[in-house]
C-alpha cells in the first residue's frame, strides 16, 4: 500500500492490493476466526449474549466491599457512543445490585495521550479491581501489555472484538464491542446494491486499529466486485473539521466520485457539511455507529445510510461481565453486539423502534 503524507491530512494513494487488505488486521483473531479456533467459547458467548438481552438478575453473592472501577474513554467527540455506554453500564450495575465506585476520564481521540497515560497510571496506583479502556494505537497496546504482565487489575477492552494473538495465554478479562469488520461489510453490501458504479473515496479515522478494521475491510469487500474503483483515501484527525477539509479535497481532485465511505461519526458529519456547501449531495455518504447525531442527520437527508449499533448492549455487557466474575463464573473472552442498517428512507416508526432498543438504558 503506497502512502503519501499531506499535512494536516494523510492522503493514501489509491493503490490497494487485495493481499494487503486481507492482512489489514494481521496479529488479531477475526471474531469468526476466533470462535472457529476456540469452539468452546461459542456456547458461553451465546449464553452471555442472551444474558445481555434479558432483564437484569441480581448478584447472587455478598460483597465485602464495593468494587473499584476505572474507566478511561475517548468520549470528547460528537458521537455519543462512549457517554451512552457508561450511562448504560452504571444503570445496569445498579439494577444488578452491585456496589461499586467508579472513576472515569473522557479524553479526545488521537490527542490527549498524556492525559490518558496519567489516568491509566492512577488507575493502577489506586489498585482498581477493573480497568475499562480501549485499544486503537501502539501506545494503548504498550500500556495494556504492562497491565497484563504486572498488575492484578482486571482489564476490559472496549470497542474491540478481535483478540490479540500475541496475548494468547495472558489475555485481558474481556473484549467488548461491535465488530468493526462486520459493520464495514454491511455498509459495503449497501453501497454495492445502491451506489452508482463510479469511483469512490474513503475517509479514515485517525491511524490505528479502527481505521484498519472499518476502512481496509470495506475496501477489500468493494474490490471483490470490481465495479467500484477507489479514487482516494484520507486519514483524518478523527474530527468533524478534518472530515470537512478532506471532503473538500476529495471533490476538488475527484469530482466524478459516486460516494464517500466515512469510518466514524464526526468524520461523516464533516463530510456531509462539505457536500452540502459544494451542492454535491448527489454524492452519497454514510455514518458509522448510528448515534443521536447521525440519526438526526439521516432524518434531514444529510447522510444516506449508517450501521446502527445497539449501543447500550456493550454497557450492559460490561456490567454482566463484572457480575459473572464476582460470582466466579467463566466469562467469555469476546462479546460482539448487534448492528442494524438504517437509511434515510426508513420510516420514523422503525427509527423509533430501533432507538428504544439501542438506548434502552441511556435514554432513561
UniProtKB/Swiss-Prot annotation:
Pfam name, any one: Peripla_BP_4
A molecular-function term among this protein's GO annotations: DNA-binding transcription factor activity
Origin: domain of life: Bacteria
Signal peptide: 1-22
GO CC annotations, alphabetized: periplasmic space
Keywords on record: Periplasm, Signal
Disulfide bonds: none
Entry's localization field: Periplasm
GO biological process, one term: regulation of DNA-templated transcription
Task of the protein: Binds to the signaling molecule autoinducer 2 (AI-2), a furanosyl borate diester, (3a-methyl-5,6-dihydrofuro-[2,3d][1,3,2]dioxaborole-2,2,6,6a-tetraol). This complex then interacts with the LuxQ sensor protein.
Family to which the UniProt record says this protein belongs: Belongs to the bacterial solute-binding protein 2 family.
Name of the protein in question: Autoinducer 2-binding periplasmic protein LuxP
Species lineage: Bacteria, Pseudomonadati, Pseudomonadota, Gammaproteobacteria, Vibrionales
Gene this chain is encoded by: luxP
Amino acid at each position: 500500500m503506497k502512502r503519501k503524507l499531506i499535512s494536516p491530512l494523510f492522503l493514501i494513494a489509491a493503490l490497494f492490493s487485495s493481499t494487503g487488505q486481507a492482512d489489514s488486521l494481521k496479529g488479531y483473531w477475526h471474531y469468526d476466526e476466533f470462535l472457529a479456533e476456540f469452539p468452546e467459547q461459542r456456547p458461553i458467548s451465546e449464553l452471555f449474549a442472551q444474558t445481555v438481552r434479558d432483564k437484569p438478575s441480581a448478584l447472587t453473592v455478598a460483597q465485602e466491599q464495593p468494587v473499584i472501577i476505572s474507566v478511561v474513554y475517548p468520549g470528547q467527540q460528537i458521537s455519543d457512543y462512549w457517554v451512552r455506554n457508561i450511562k448504560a453500564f452504571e444503570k445496569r450495575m445498579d439494577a444488578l445490585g452491585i456496589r461499586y465506585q467508579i472513576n472515569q476520564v473522557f479524553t479526545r481521540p488521537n490527542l490527549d495521550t498524556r492525559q490518558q497515560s496519567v489516568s491509566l497510571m492512577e488507575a493502577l496506583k489506586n489498585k482498581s479491581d477493573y480497568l475499562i479502556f480501549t485499544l486503537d494505537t501502539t501506545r494503548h497496546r504498550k500500556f495494556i501489555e504492562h497491565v497484563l504482565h504486572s498488575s492484578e487489575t482486571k482489564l476490559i477492552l472496549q470497542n474491540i472484538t478481535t483478540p490479540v494473538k500475541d496475548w494468547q495465554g495472558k489475555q485481558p478479562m474481556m473484549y467488548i464491542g461491535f465488530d468493526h469488520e462486520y459493520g464495514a461489510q454491511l455498509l459495503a453490501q449497501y453501497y454495492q446494491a445502491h451506489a452508482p458504479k463510479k469511483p469512490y473515496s474513503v475517509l479514515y479515522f485517525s491511524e490505528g486499529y479502527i481505521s484498519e478494521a472499518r476502512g481496509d475491510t470495506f475496501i477489500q469487500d468493494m474490490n471483490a466486485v470490481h465495479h467500484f474503483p477507489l479514487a482516494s483515501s484520507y486519514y483524518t484527525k478523527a474530527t468533524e473539521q478534518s472530515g470537512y477539509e478532506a471532503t473538500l479535497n476529495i471533490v476538488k481532485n475527484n469530482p466524478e466520485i459516486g460516494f464517500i465511505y466515512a469510518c466514524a461519526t464526526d468524520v461523516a458529519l464533516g463530510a456531509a457539511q462539505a457536500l452540502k456547501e459544494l451542492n454535491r449531495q448527489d454524492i452519497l455518504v454514510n455514518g458509522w455507529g448510528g448515534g443521536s447525531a447521525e440519526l438526526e442527520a439521516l432524518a434531514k437527508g444529510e447522510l444516506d445510510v449508517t450501521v446502527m449499533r445497539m449501543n447500550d448492549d456493550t454497557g450492559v455487557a460490561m456490567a454482566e461481565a463484572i457480575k459473572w466474575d464476582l460470582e466466579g463464573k467463566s466469562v467469555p473472552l469476546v462479546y460482539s453486539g448487534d448492528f442494524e442498517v438504517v437509511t434515510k428512507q426508513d420510516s420514523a416508526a422503525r427509527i423509533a423502534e430501533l432507538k428504544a432498543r439501542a438506548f434502552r438504558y441511556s435514554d432513561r
